[in-house]
Amino acid sequence: MMMTKQKSTLTERLNIGGDEVRELKLGATFNPKNTSTAFHTIKYDFKPASVDTSRMATVDVGSNNQVTVTVPNLESSGVPQTVYKGNHKKYTKECLIIFDKETGAITLERLNHNIQVKKTRSEVTNKPSLMSATNAPMSNGAPVPSSAAAGTGSAGKLENSTMRISSKTKVSTGSRRNNIIDFKPRNSPMQQSSPSRPVASHRSPQSAPAWHANNAQQTLPSIPMIMDDDDFGLSAALHNGSQANISGSSTGSSAGQPDYASVHSGKQRQATPQGHAKRQQLTQRSSPPMQQQQHQNYGRGSNNYAQQQQQQQQQQLQQRASFSHSNHSNSMPMDMDSPTHNEQTAQSMAQAAAALEQQIGGELSASSSSSESDSSDSDSGSDSDDSTEDDRPNHHTNQQLPPAQQPQHHHMQHQQQQHMHQLPNLELGSVSPAYNSHHHHQQQQQSHHHHHHQQQQQQQHQQSGIYASNGGFPNDLLQNDLQLSSNSSDDDDD
C-alpha cells in the first residue's frame, strides 16, 4: 500500500506513466578516472524569502575545508546579499538519482561532499534542513544553479530578517549593557551606603544615649530647682515673721510634706533664735486643729517614732520647762539651744516641783478626810520615790524655814500654784503637734549638737529624776501634777 502510494507519487511527480521497466544508468562519478564531474549537497539552516532566484550564487572553498556561499537578494528587500559560511565533509555511500525529462533516462551518481552552512551574523547552532541539491554535469548545470539559487535565495531572505533582528538585538543588547552599567553605579552607591549605614546605625545608638543623657540632665535638676524656689519662698516668708506662713509650714510638714519646708524653716529658726519662743507659743496656741494631722503623721512615721521616743520625751520636757519659765517670769524669749539656760530652767523646775510637793504634803496631812489623806499619801509616796538626791536637800531646807519667812514662802507657793493653774490653757494636745512640726529641725540640730544633747540628757537624769525614772509619756506626768495642784487649790479654798 505504501509502495503503491510512493510509486504513484513518484510517477505523478516525474510524470512517468505505465508499468514499464526503465534502465538505470551509472554516472561518470562511478568511474575512478573521472576528475571533472562531482556532485555536492549544500544544506542551509533556513531559506529566506528575499532570495533572488534569477541570479547565480557563488561558492568559495577556502583552506581547512571552509566554504563561503553568497546568495543575492531581491532589490526590494533592502539587503544586497546573504552570506553563509560553514565546512564540508565527504560522503562515503550516499548517491543521487538524476531523471532527465526530455530523454527519460535515469542516472545514478555518487555524492562527493556535504556542505553545511549557516548565516555569518547569527551565531545560532547549525540546524540544517536536509535539502537534496542536484548538481548536474556541465551540460545539466542549469538546474544546479537554480536549486542553489533557490537555496541561496531563501538564505538571503533569512539574512535580511536576521540582519534586522540582529540590529534590533544589538540595540537591545546595548540597552541591556547600558542598564547593567546603570545598575552598577546604582548598586555601587548602595554598596557604599551599606557600609555607611551600619556606621550610621553604630553612631545612632551613641547619639541616642547622649541625647537621653542630656535630657535626663536637663529634666532632673529642673524639678528640685522648682522645689528649691518654693522652699526659698517659704523661708523668705518665715524670715519676714509672718505667723500665718509659720503655721502653714508646720501644718504642711505634719500633713506629710516635711521634705523641704521643715528643713528651711528649721534653718530659719536657727538663724533667728530670739523670736523662737514667741513663734513656738503662737504655733502651740493656734495648733489644736492639728491633732488629726499629727495622728496621721504618727501613722506614717511609726517606724521612726519607736526609735526616737526617748529623745522626744526629753525635748518635750525642755519645751515645757521653757514655757513654764516664760509664763512665770514674763521675761524676754530665750534660746533653747543654750546649755546654761537649760540648766537654769531645769533647776528652777525642780525647785518649783519640790516646793509644790512640800506644800501639798503638808496640807493633805492636815486634812481630816480619809479619802484625801489616802490619795495624798499615795501621791506623796510616788513623788518621793521619783525624786532624786539633788531634790532632797531642797525639801530639808524648805522644812527648816524660820517662822518669819513662812508667809513669804507661802506667798511664793501661791503664785506658783496660780501659774500651774494656767498650764491647762496651753492645751496638752498642742504640745505634741508643735513638737511634731519641729521634729525634723530638732533632728538636724541633734546631728550637729549630738555631744551637747548627751550632756543635757545627763543633766536631766540628775536634776529631774521624776521624769527620767518614769518611762511613760510626759503628758501623763503633767496631768498628774495638775491634779495635785487642783487638789491643793481646793484645800486652800476650804
Curated annotation (Swiss-Prot):
Record-linked Pfam families: EAF
Electron transport in keyword set: no
Region Disordered, residue ranges: 119-212, 243-494
Gene Ontology molecular functions: transcription elongation factor activity
Signal peptide: none
Annotated localization: Nucleus
Main location: nucleus
Family: Belongs to the EAF family.
Protein name listed in UniProt: Ell-associated factor Eaf
UniProt source species: Drosophila virilis (Fruit fly)
Chain's gene name: Eaf
